[in-house]
Amino acid sequence: MTNKGRAGTGPAPCPCGNGAYDTCCGRFHRGEASPPTAEALMRSRYSAYVLGDVSWLRQTWHASTCPPDLSADPGTNWLGLTVKSHAQQDATHATVEFVARYKVGGRAHRLHELSRFVFESREPGEASRWLYVDGDLREPA
């Protein structure tokens, strides 16, 4: 993603909706920083889906639950993210409830999930960091 918005009007917005990409999720995707909270990680993962950054998705998915194929549907058009809640259970466990809106083939959809995260190393010898474990889909309200 470039650092300019439309017609050079300023920094490109972050897909997660929380600021400029370069200073929001971009710094995580480039490896300049690690997301400090489960919510920041979840936002960075949403942005990775929007941008097709499969490498970031794999790096931030817990090894015990990461599927072998993370290829995205190229026909998916992500429209926006709303974080409904972020709860810290203890120092190493958190949940984030969110709604992601998207279109496939012109039809609008919503992904409403309560995601679980752990703070640990993905590989032996790595520093601990937030990792996505799994989530429960929520029914539309």
Swiss-Prot record:
Protein name listed in UniProt: UPF0225 protein Rmet_0111
Alphabetized InterPro entries for the sequence: NTF2-like_dom_sf, UPF0225, YchJ-like_M
NCBIfam families: PRK01842.1
Source organism phylogeny: Bacteria, Pseudomonadati, Pseudomonadota, Betaproteobacteria, Burkholderiales
SUPFAM superfamilies reported in the protein's UniProt record: NTF2-like
Family as reported in the entry's similarity comment: Belongs to the UPF0225 family.
Coiled coil: none
